[in-house]
A protein has these predicted regions:
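Right-hand nucleic-acid polymerase module
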Residues: 1-127, 137-246
Length: 246
């Protein structure tokens, strides 16, 4: 549960594309504001990490061809990107480097690589920004070595649930040396979307007060259904009538 929840205007009663810019009248002023998670505290980041863990495990279930990577940025390239694109900040530079790399990949393959990556600051003397990630696809190693020109490349040939658990922990890792730094997720859209077509997802079908908003893990444990799946499975009516559990 969020450590620092905040009040925001209820989007249901704000102008948007769905209501054609004419929102419905708010029947009760107490509904004008709703409580929302801050999205930045330790608990929020941990909850997001759990959601990503589930989604990547689902992706791996349907697409087991995946590799683990670590990519670094040498100082020369870091400064070059910083100056050329007039950007500041480790995460911004890493994001731009990733964008440029994927553009080179698309130029060669005519398509992008499905990926989930996160930034981290090094713990050694250089404290250099680097990127950990999981890529889905076949025969990627030579392509990566050909196109990533910014620094060191490490490639792990196997990805398991342990790998996913390891990499998602960077989302809420406590870094005493860099207490204000938060790793930035850089990823493809639709990771793990296959779950919504599985038989298990039918158990989440809206059923009033009896709606089951849980996801069953491989070990049998049940956790709250990740927000991504909740938004995919339920209609707007269902979302408004099924309370979001902490």
């Amino acid at each position: 549960m969020c450590l620092y929840p905040k009040l925001i205007l209820n989007r249901k009663y704000l102008p948007n594309k769905k209501n054609g810019g004419i929102p419905p009248k708010c029947p009760d002023e107490r509904l004008r504001y709703v409580t929302a998670a801050c999205g930045k505290c330790y608990e929020c980041r941990k909850q997001k990490a759990r959601g990503w863990l589930v989604r990547m495990e689902e992706e791996l279930r349907h697409n087991p061809n995946a590799i683990f990577i670590t990519l670094t940025l040498e100082d020369k390239w870091y400064k070059d990107i910083e100056k050329k694109y007039n950007i500041k900040g480790d995460n911004n530079v890493a994001t731009q480097a990733m964008r440029l790399w994927l553009e080179r990949v698309r130029k060669i393959t005519k398509k992008s690589i499905k990926h989930w990556c996160i930034t981290e600051l090094g713990g050694n003397d250089t404290e250099r920004i680097h990127i950990h990630g999981i890529l889905w696809g076949v025969g990627l190693e030579s392509l990566i070595r050909e196109t990533w020109k910014y620094g060191f490349i490490f490639i792990g040939q196997y990805v398991t649930e342990k790998t996913i658990n390891y990499i998602t922990k960077y989302m809420y890792k406590k870094d005493e040396k860099h207490p204000t730094f938060t790793g930035k997720v850089l990823c493809s859209a639709g990771i793990g979307s296959q779950y919504t077509t599985r038989a298990d997802a039918k158990n989440n079908k809206y059923n009033g007060e009896n709606t089951k908003e849980t996801y069953r893990c491989k070990n049998g444990a049940k956790i709250n259904l990740p927000i991504y799946y909740r938004n995919k499975i339920y209609t707007e009516y269902s979302l408004n009538n099924v309370p979001l559990k902490p």
